[in-house]
Amino acid sequence: MAKNRRDRNSWGGFSEKTYEWSSEEEEPVKKAGPVQVLIVKDDHSFELDETALNRILLSEAVRDKEVVAVSVAGAFRKGKSFLMDFMLRYMYNQESVDWVGDYNEPLTGFSWRGGSERETTGIQIWSEVFLINKPDGKKVAVLLMDTQGTFDSQSTLRDSATVFALSTMISSIQVYNLSQNVQEDDLQHLQLFTEYGRLAMEETFLKPFQSLIFLVRDWSFPYEFSYGADGGAKFLEKRLKVSGNQHEELQNVRKHIHSCFTNISCFLLPHPGLKVATNPNFDGKLKEIDDEFIKNLKILIPWLLSPESLDIKEINGNKITCRGLVEYFKAYIKIYQGEELPHPKSMLQATAEANNLAAVATAKDTYNKKMEEICGGDKPFLAPNDLQSKHLQLKEESVKLFRGVKKMGGEEFSRRYLQQLESEIDELYIQYIKHNDSKNIFHAARTPATLFVVIFITYVIAGVTGFIGLDIIASLCNMIMGLTLITLCTWAYIRYSGEYRELGAVIDQVAAALWDQGSTNEALYKLYSAAATHRHLYHQAFPTPKSESTEQSEKKKM
C-alpha cells in the first residue's frame, strides 16, 4: 500500500517521499513517525494496537528504562499536533542553541493542518523513544503522545472523556491545551475527565496524576498577566483560587483539580499571527509566524522538555519503566471496552491489576535471565538434581522480589498474581528441563536403548525357559520380544517419516518410565494412561471393517 512519508533532516524537519508498504513485517525499517496505538472505531469502541505498542516500548534499548510520558490534550483544532512538532524539533536538536531550525523549513512530524475539521484520532505516539540524561546522570526514556481533540462533531462525550482520561492516566506530564483563556467549562471538563483520579485517591491516599500544565494559547491580555510561566503562575493562582464567597460547585471543581495532580502550572502563549490563522496553505514555516510567538515558543519547549524538567512516570510511588507502561496501557484500555463510561473506581482496580502484572513480569523476567545464565542455549548439560535445586532457589528469589514491590489492591488482591507467577515459573522450568535434556547425548538414545534391553532380556529368558521345558513362559517372552521389536521398528519409522507423532510420544513415555523408574507398575500405568488418551490412534491404524462393526451393533441391539 502506498503511503506518503517524510524523511527527517538535520533541523528536525522532513522532506516528503513516497514508500510502498505492503505488510506489518516491513514496518521496522520505516523512519521515525507517528504511530496510532489507540484506535477509535466507527462504532465508538476502542482498540489498542498492542503490536505497535510492544514494538516501540519493548525494544531492547528502552524497555527497562524509566519512562517520561509527555501528552498534549484539549479541544480539537487548537494546535496540539502543531505544538508536538516543535517538541520533536527540540528533542532532535536540543544540543543546538537554535533548535527551532531554518525559518524556511516546513513543520512536519505529527500530522497537522489548518481548517475546522479534526485531524488526529485516538492516541498517537512517536515511534522513536528519546533517551535523555537527567542532571543526576540517570538515563530516562521520553515518550511523546498526541491525542484526539475533545468534543469534535464526530465524537461522543464518552470518546472525548476516554481519550483524555487515558492520556492523563498514562502520562507523567499532561499539557492541557486551551485557547485564549481558562474558562469555567474547561475546568468542569477537566473535573469530569479526572473523576477517576479523585476516587482512586480516596482509596490510596495519594494523588493519582502527576504534572498538569495549562497551556493557554492566543493569550490576548499580556498587560494583565505577562506571557510565559511567571505570568501563567499568577494567572492560574487567581483562576484556581478557592474563596468563601464562591458557590459550592465552583469550590468543589477547584478542590478536585488540586486533589488530583501533584504539580499544576501554567504558561501563557501569544497568538502566532494572522498568516497562520487565515492562510489555508500555511505549512509551518517560521518566517510566517510572529516573532513574539517564536520568542515565547523558545522558552516554552525547553521549560517542558529540558532534562531537569522531566518527570518520571510514577504510580503509587513506584517509578515505571517502558515495560511496565505497556502493562498499564493494556490494563487501562480494558475498562473502556464497554458501552458506557466505567465506574471511576474501576480505574483503581485496573491500576492495581497493571501494578501486579508489572511486578509479575519483572519477577518472571528475573527468573528467566538467571536460568538462561545457568542452562541457556550455549551452556552445557546440567545434572537434573542441580537444575532442580537452582530452580527452587531462583523461584524463591522471584517470589521474594514480587512481594517486595509496592503493589496496589492489598495482599488479598495480589495473592492470585503470586499464584500466577509461581505457575508461570513452573511452566518455564518444564521448558528448561526439556531444553537441558536435549543436550544429553544419551537422552536421544533412551527409547531405542530401553527397547533393545527389553528385547535382550526377553530373548535370554525365552531361551533359558525353553531349554528347561517351561514352554508357556518361553512363548510369552517370545511374544513380548516380538511386540517390542515391532514397537522399535514403528518408533524408527515415526522418527524417520514424522508421521504418527502422537504414537511416537506414547512409546517415548513408556520407555521413559522403564528407564527412569525401572518400575513395571509405573510403566504399565503410563501405558494404560497413554492408551486411554490416544485410543483414536489404534482405530486409525487398525480400522474396523464396516460390515463387522454393523454386525456387532446389531448383536448389541438384540
Curated annotation (Swiss-Prot):
Localization recorded for this chain is:
Endoplasmic reticulum membrane; Golgi apparatus membrane; Cell projection, Axon
| Pfam families tied to this protein | GBP
Q: Tell me which positions the record assigns to the signal sequence.
A: none
Q: List-wise, which residues carry N6-acetyllysine?
A: 395
| EC number(s) given by UniProt | 3.6.5.-
Enumerate the residue ranges of region (Autoinhibitory domain).
521-558
Q: Say what the protein does.
A: Atlastin-1 (ATL1) is a membrane-anchored GTPase that mediates the GTP-dependent fusion of endoplasmic reticulum (ER) membranes, maintaining the continuous ER network. It facilitates the formation of three-way junctions where ER tubules intersect. Two atlastin-1 on neighboring ER tubules bind GTP and form loose homodimers through the GB1/RHD3-type G domains and 3HB regions. Upon GTP hydrolysis, the 3HB regions tighten, pulling the membranes together to drive their fusion. After fusion, the homodimer disassembles upon release of inorganic phosphate (Pi).
Q: How does it assemble?
A: Monomeric and homodimeric. The homodimer, transiently formed by two molecules on opposing membranes, is the active form mediating ER membrane fusion. Interacts with REEP1, REEP5, RTN3 and RTN4 (via the transmembrane region); these proteins are involved in endoplasmic reticulum tubular network organization. Interacts with ZFYVE27; both proteins are involved in endoplasmic reticulum tubular network organization. Interacts with ARL6IP1; both proteins are involved in endoplasmic reticulum tubular network organization.
The Swiss-Prot or TrEMBL note on domains reads: The N-terminal hypervariable region (HVR) regulates ATL1-mediated membrane tethering by organizing ATL1 into a lattice structure on the same membrane. It does not affect GTP hydrolysis or membrane fusion. It has no effect on the GTP hydrolysis and fusion steps. The GB1/RHD3-type G domain mediates GTP-binding and hydrolysis as well as homodimerization.
Q: What is this protein called?
A: Atlastin-1
Species in which this protein is naturally found = Macaca fascicularis
